[in-house]
Amino acid sequence: MNKKTLKDLNVENKRVLVRVDFNVPIKEGIITDTNRIEASLTTIKYLIDNNAKVILMSHLGRPKGEPKPEFSLKPVAQKLSEMIGQDVKFIDSDKVVDDSVIEESKKLQPKEIMLIQNTRFRKEEEKNDQTFSKELSQLADLYVNDAFGTSHRAHASNVGVSKFLPSAVGFLVQKEIEIMGKALENPERPFTAILGGAKVSDKIGVIENLLDKVDTILIGGAMAFTFIKSQGKNVGKSLIEEDKLDLAKSLLEKAQEKGVKIFLPVDFVVAKEMTEESDSKVINIDDFTDDIAGFDIGTKTIKIFDEEIQKSKTIVWNGPMGVFEIEQFSKGTFEIANSLVKSKAITIVGGGDSASAIAKSGNKDKVTHVSTGGGASLEFLEGKVLPGIDCIDER
């Protein structure tokens, strides 16, 4: 990796400003999922162990550029204190950063931690405003980006601030880039991509980029119906993107030209309605009637996908196989998760829904890597440059 990493910086006695991703779900003041906080602990602990003065910043939710108490990071400071076993000073300012906040950063002693208020309380954050970036930079001597999940966005707290301070990536971002980068650039083969989710339009860039890299693509989720319909088959009232039929057809043709095997589902779990109560059954792809829709891949498809997964040496999975939030349409997604774990391959799970699914299936610790970025991991798989990483100092 050609970017500076945390270990390239001398952090002793320095104020280090770290962009973390503490965008966690909070219900009635209680954090319901601490994964993103956990993901940042390696970097924070390293800084404490090396006598740095630690200043943390993050966004939370979408307060639309103004202070809103329900989006305060105060509960996060309390939870982080518990998790790390030491006090985290929460500096609550509606302006996020002002003279008093800068003063607090100057009072910090080595090994102490402070967390500033939600960066999105300022509308300048999402505009990557130069003045706000400069204000943030006055909190510290060094800047570290450890928020992979926001690295596909160019905001003040992850891109703007890097123009004013020496910078590096933290351990979480480093791990994301190294693991996913190796999979894309130098994979052990056979290399299989499993793609799901509702829309082809969300995954076009990923498919186009992966056609030059993978040996096999397994397509599930509702996006499969657009591909199947592009071959002239009836899919009942299943979700399709009419304006993407020609594109789906051309992607299948491109795959054939490049010698990439694409597997589409051969059977589906179908029902008249997408509810827990609706009667569901498994049908073959040729047996669709106009009054039903597919909401999960069927048992034959699971078996075919599993056989391909077991042959693979590298696997990237992004997007669920069905509506896994509803129990009767969740089997495909959870069986694929189990199949990944059973394989002897390097297994990388993209962020967002796939990360939730792997966690829900109890297999989070049994795959090689679960990405912390939904949109960021998608854009990385598309081969796009991520601004939050691009701006970091070169080694």
Curated annotation (Swiss-Prot):
- A Pfam family of the record is PGK
**Which residues participate in ATP binding?**
203, 294, 325, 351-354
Pathway assignment = Carbohydrate degradation; glycolysis; pyruvate from D-glyceraldehyde 3-phosphate: step 2/5
**Keyword annotations of the record:** ATP-binding, Cytoplasm, Glycolysis, Kinase, Nucleotide-binding, Transferase
Q: Which GO terms describe its molecular function?
A: ADP binding; ATP binding; phosphoglycerate kinase activity
- Enzyme Commission numbers on file: 2.7.2.3
Class of the enzyme per the UniProt entry, highest EC level: transferase
Q: What GO biological process, any one, is recorded here?
A: gluconeogenesis
Q: What is its main location?
A: cytoplasm
Catalytic activity from the UniProt record? (2R)-3-phosphoglycerate + ATP = (2R)-3-phospho-glyceroyl phosphate + ADP
Where is the protein found, in the record's own terms? Cytoplasm
Q: Name one GO cellular component term.
A: cytosol
Superkingdom per UniProt: Bacteria
Ligand binding (substrate): 21-23, 36, 59-62, 120, 153
The family classification in the record reads: Belongs to the phosphoglycerate kinase family.
Binding partners and assembly = Monomer.
Give the protein name, as stated in the record: Phosphoglycerate kinase
